[in-house]
Amino acid sequence: MNAEIFVVPTVGELAAFLGRLPAGEKNLIFCEDRLTLEAERAVARAQGVAFDTKVTTFARFLGGGRKVLSKQGSVLVVGGIAASLSGKLRCFGKSPAGCAGRRYETIAQLRAALITPELLDEARAGADRVLADKLADISLVYRGYLDFLARGWLDESGVLSLLPEAMQKGGAAGANVYFVGFSSFTRQAAEGIRAALSLAKSVSAVLIGGEEALYTNEAVHDFEKYCALAGAACRRTYIPSALCPEAEALRRTLFDPAYPVPVNARNVHLFEGADEEDELVYAATVIQSEVLDRGLRYRDVALLLGDPKGSRVALEKVFGEYGIPYYADVKRTLAAHPLARFVLGWFALLSEGFDPADADAFVGSEFFGGDRRSRELYRNYLLHYANYRGGARRPVKEGADDPLVLDALRSRLLSAFDGASAAMTGGQYCRLVRGLLEKFECGKVQDELAAALEGQGLRAESAYMARGLESILRVLSEAEELSGGTKMRAEEFSSVLSEALTALEVSLIPQYLDAVFVGDVAESRICGAKTVIAAGLTDAVPACGADTALITDRDIDRLRTLKVELSPKIREVNARARENVG
């Protein structure tokens, strides 16, 4: 069978292509998670409720019923394995659990490229000493991780290995199969392409690309390569752009060093503000004009920012003053939640022997409980009389103001550590943290804080606050199941837990039916907006990642000479970010 590649210049053209799929035929559409909503909308707009067309991701297509590790679960496992191997690690022995997240990302990258620990061991013979030691450490942890998975677990990478079998059982046979909007294809995903070629009625890829400097065309080349390995030829068809002249001029010249030919623009307006807040004020006035003068709804407007997380405070201030409802499409890491910081602060006190700064932060948290005046009184006492390691454990000194209040708060602080020691199993730590959350009524405090934020009109912040306890309990349950019997020092378990909390990102449900969409100019995928405003477009957009991976670009180049093919390199990731901005 031969395959078709349709190269489209924009997400809008991609959605339009899906809207033209023939009705009455069995269509199976695979796309990246960030594009599923746009793909489903495109199919539904064209065909109504399209029972004959299924839009899915690889993970959703494989379905449930399996013991699948979440990303944070994998981080917990890798961190626990690294901690248990600390005496054998050459490069990462000092803080084995400290980079569990990056170590898991490296293992996932290796698995996606079908690189085994044995291949890493073979590559060590031709590597320099530093790279050889690094590969030895990664291989050790990688083997331990694979041994863990062999007990009946699947992780995000392992799920893809089931794709060919799932295609045979799950409806690919006789269907028109489309691979839509992928930025690249891994060697694992290539097995899915091979299976589709052997089972489907037709196989096509609808991918974003073009001849302009904006595009990497990485996915197009990958798809052609993997089809050729499966014995199939590909035919490329370029879909022309349907953008208005101004937008088309931008598309053709974005990131092109040649200065563009001036174009008369009625639909594009430029404004240069003095600072970020000035730009957002201008954006707010434009939005109000679009809604009040042109009759648009707020949901017809999209605001794309260079750094949505960094602009969060200014955005809340400006849009709050103008009364503009908005939904920020930004995932927030659980590690930044105040309750997560309270839990990690508990571990810091335990592992660092009640350092004064840790004691001050722990007592100062709203989750410590009690009225604020009493907490401030106790914090001032600790600063004046107990500003040394272990000072918070000591009895309240005679002559201190309000000794009864101080003694009650000291007792409350010490009660949080009943039964705790600096070295315990993961399961014991998890049970102690659950006890802490219950004893200090953290659920009740969280509800009060969420209600207060709601009362101030900060709906997104309120929604984020309300998600803390349930998410932390979920991570604790995973930690107990995955590393409950492993004995660790408090700082090791805290480090692994912190990495897992960082890996768990919280997506917020829109709090308004009619709201401006606010997203990342390099990440968001939205093609239904009637007015698009881009702000914060400094020379830092798109953000360029630094080469901080455990296996650097230089290492990847060296491994490729040793017949170990690993990707992507950081420059390839940065090139994809440029394409996403366009």
What are these regions (language model features)?
Residues 189-273:
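Conserved RecA-like helicase ATPase core segment
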Residues 2-55, 66-67, 193-194, 242-582:
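Anion-coordinating catalytic cores for phosphoryl-, nucleotidyl-, and glycosidic chemistry
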